[in-house]
């Protein structure tokens, strides 16, 4: 995700000793090697598609067996009070590194990765664009994954981080921009951090993503993503004007033709061959006319276009699964599916109420005072005012 600055330290601290105890239970066979073969990189999935040991991005995110036996880690994840995507323990061997790369696919464009170091040393350095930091054990960090970044472990010890991907609510981003410390801020000042310890008597409830990829991407999102890419391409002074103009025309044609197909077929199967043909033809043209174009700090524009838009705009393999889950959500109140939905809502309320993300006074009031049937009714707080002029007042 793009951020105004390369790094932000969030105002939370966690119990490193308890975290270390929980990762000690895992054996070497539990650690899965990196899916792209990065030497010295391994991980243990904690939240994944269908709760399985995979590297998938699309589908319902569920806790894995590894998370089920890690109560403090589960409490930490739940403490954010956010809708969670993928989570894992990420390990970097002594002397190893995470190679220089940028996260340009659809999943990470609007999701940030939260890092909580568990075992680390000063010799572990995280680089992003032209900045670098050491993330201390028990701290909480996010970074701009759209920019090129890498990690070096120049120590003789394993580095292990707990990470979780999330899109972030307004409360989360308010915490980032109002209560956190960016790499541009004075690093000599003390960050006022909240300690989140382990409570063995407090069960944790997670809220996880259920819908994270469209069968066919709506026109508005296609247009938004392509405009974002195009703006960055135009902003890079090293790109040739002729190539930028050719890419601009290609994007405009693609969006216009996608809109025509959407108006005719929306997500129905009859349109699938036409959507596929359009994205295939567009990608071929992009490779011919725009292969030299570069984003500002993130590498190839054509590669980003492919990963962010072309690959992501059509996921027909999810159609039956999504239809079944949507039907369950809209089923009658007395059905088993409705009971499951009620439990999800209950879980959401429970998790949000214990969130470490600060709430505004208005949000706290809204949770304390139940709304009456009509906004013109007397406010339940007993003030004598109408609800709309008291606790229901819209600022």
Predicted feature locations:
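Conserved short histidine dyad/triad with adjacent acidic residue
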Residues: 89-107
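A short hydrophobic beta-strand segment most commonly corresponding to one strand
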Residues: 110-117, 140, 156-174
